[in-house]
Amino acid sequence: MNVGELCKRAPVTAKPFDDLVAVAQLMRKEHVGYIVVVEPSVHESAFNPIGVVTDRDIVIGVVAKGVDPKSLQVSDVMSREPALAFEEESVGAALRKMRKIGVRRLPVVGKLEELIGVISLDDIIDKLVGELEDAAGSIRSEQMIERALRK
């Protein structure tokens, strides 16, 4: 399975010069803890990811330091040049990338590095658990059939 099949499309995004408080409110409204920061692409109606902001970035990097978030823009706290997962990349490769750099989410991009979606560790785990449950169900069914035939 590739990343493009599993990722969540149309992720919540922000621009670098957006007000940080407004973006925090957007996170709350949309029930997300991760926003991809984008800039317009040279390709029509596409956007390229240039950074990410997490709820943790805001809490640890701003609030806990006593900095007034009203005085900041997204670009002041975003992580720049995020690692990316490509749409055609395998889910296993994306998982290894996440583990190597210590993140739980990656922006997903197309061939021209235009933003397509976001893949998270939770998405991958949910998919794997579902597949394991399906496999376990098949094994149980086979065992039940075998027992019935032996009677």
Protein language model regions, located:
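Tandem CBS (Bateman) regulatory domains
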Residues: 1-10, 50-86, 90-99, 120-151
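Generic preference for well-ordered secondary structure
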Residues: 4-7, 16-19, 42, 47, ...
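The conserved cystathionine-beta-synthase
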Residues: 13-32, 37-41, 85-102, 109, ...
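A glycine-centered beta-loop-beta connector
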Residues: 27-30, 35-57, 98, 106-122
